[in-house]
Amino acid sequence: MKRLWTVFAITLLALTAAGPVLAQGDPFTGTWKLDVAKSKYDPGPAPQSQMRTWDASGQVTIEGVNAAGKPAKYGYTLKDDGKDYPTMGAIPNGAQTVAVKRLSPNKIEANFTRDGKHAETATFSVSKDGKVLNILAKGTSPTDGKPFTNMTVWEKQ
């Protein structure tokens, strides 16, 4: 009987310690605001503002004002299962699908395709404190085929 209580106590202790870790969930989930001043768009131009909402299922919606001052809304599904998922709305890179792999708990890589060809690779990294999301995106423009590199900084809301 004493052994049973010992096993029970150890199990309870382990579950209690794991609770906060399990409750934290995916570090990408939440609402993120683009810090335009800290972000770099090469060749540009940068959007005027953006908010990124990332839900627990991996659905990402981006809303804001583009460089021309017009409202913009688009999205995609970022599930780290390596499968292609369709994009939604007028995504700036012109991609129709995206596939994701997780590199670490706080880092994923997304590969976007346009007309069946690679359009962009984006690496998403959440800081250890969970307050900052950095996205490094490298690809080719859908309008002129020239390369672009964007390093964007997002603050958790």
How should these model regions be labeled?
Residues 1-9:
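Bacterial N-terminal signal peptides that target proteins for export
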